[in-house]
Amino acid sequence: RLMKNNGVDVSDMPKSPVYVALGGKAVGAVGIDGEVRPEAAETIKKLRKLGVEHSVMLTGDTAEQARKVCSVCDIDDFRSGLLPQDKLSSLEDIKDGSKGVIYVGDGINDAPVLACADVGVAMGLGTQAACEAADVILTDSELSRLADTVYQSKRAMSVLRSNIAFAVIVKVVVVALGVAGLAPMW
């Protein structure tokens, strides 16, 4: 975007490029082609089994790179070429039509989005800003830990709901017995 804003044509440059311009002309680029992590597709599959209905990748990478990752990992949608403020705007749009949004990130550019998400997850002790903005910090960079965390969270919420229901039922029974004169109130 910086190059386009300065009138430099970079339309035929490779992959996720780092550009070099001189005198308003693109003179070079280094293409960065990140590998898709082996556990990424399996993690998305596990998240779907746990009830995640829709997955969206928000990235600063090119559309070509994003499409490749989404294809390999079975991610439903992507938004590419995003600056940090664009990621935040995209997340707000996604939140409008969703029951709940989990955002996973690891960099300083992710901090505002991690804070805005219903649940922000910082991976691998990313940057200090990301860790401070996140609700959950996964201390290693294994993506499979994300699915494990969602599973454990769902289990904990189930136990919590059961405990609350049990406590309310016991209170109602004791109050009813107390009103009937069959149990002391204290």
Model regions: which residues?
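Cytosolic catalytic headpiece
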Residues: 1-119, 151-154
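Membrane-embedded alpha-helical bundles of multi-pass transporters
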Residues: 49-52, 98, 109-110, 115-119, ...
